[in-house]
Design a protein with these regions (language model features):
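Short, surface-exposed secondary-structure edge patches
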Residues: 13-18, 42
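Conserved hydrophobic positions within beta-strands
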Residues: 33-35
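Short, solvent-exposed secondary-structure boundary/capping segments
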Residues: 41-52
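A short macromolecule-binding patch
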Residues: 52-67
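Charge/polar-rich, low-complexity and marginally structured segments
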Residues: 67, 72-187
Length: 187
């Protein structure tokens, strides 16, 4: 079985990773997915291998050409050590945020597109802080919900716990981060 990349590193290239049927993977901006089959197919006269995924969030199916796996950022679930690093980021109290929502939205959108757990964690933490000060815009609320779902879903699968338990862990970490930030500002 392939080793999960460190969430701080780039996703591994197609030549480095061979996905297997039955393996859970992360499809950036879609969440945890299951590799259902890998088979040759022809689309627009081009024959190539396709990885067939079932998105666990909504049971929809997606075919990704094997040649595009790196481009779309498909990666194995993170490792336990990456979950620990994720919670360190969520709890650390360091939050960078743009003052204007356009810059903040673009920065957060770029981070969400990477699919890296650490980037998604920064988006979640950033938007949580903003939501404590003022209401999030509709688009930022949706992004916050997606970021939270992606993190909760992956943590639940990696730690083999329920999504509810994973959400509780994430909520505690976010609360801890905001408390640390407030204490630091008060000092």
């Amino acid at each position: 079985m392939p080793q999960a990349p460190s969430s701080a590193s780039k996703s591994k290239g197609v030549d480095d990773v061979t996905f297997k049927v039955g393996q859970k993977v992360v499809y950036p901006n879609h969440g945890v997915s299951l590799v259902e089959k890998i088979e040759a197919g022809q689309i627009d006269g081009v024959e190539q291998l396709y990885v067939h995924l079932r998105l666990l969030a909504n049971n929809s199916k997606v075919m990704v050409p094997k040649s595009n796996l790196d481009l779309v950022g498909l990666r194995p679930l993170c490792a336990q050590r990456d979950v620990r690093a994720l919670f360190e980021i969520l709890e650390d109290g360091n939050i960078d945020t743009y003052k204007d929502w356009k810059g903040r939205y673009k920065q957060n959108l770029d981070k969400m597109k990477t699919g890296r757990l650490t980037d998604v964690a920064e988006v979640l933490k950033n938007l949580r802080l903003v939501s404590q000060r003022k209401s999030l815009s509709f688009r930022e609320k949706k992004m916050y919900e997606r970021a939270k779902y992606f993190i909760v879903s992956e943590v639940a699968h990696v730690k083999n716990i329920t999504e509810r338990d994973a959400e509780d862990l994430v909520e505690r970490a976010l609360s801890s981060s905001l408390e640390k930030r407030q204490r630091a500002k008060a000092s």
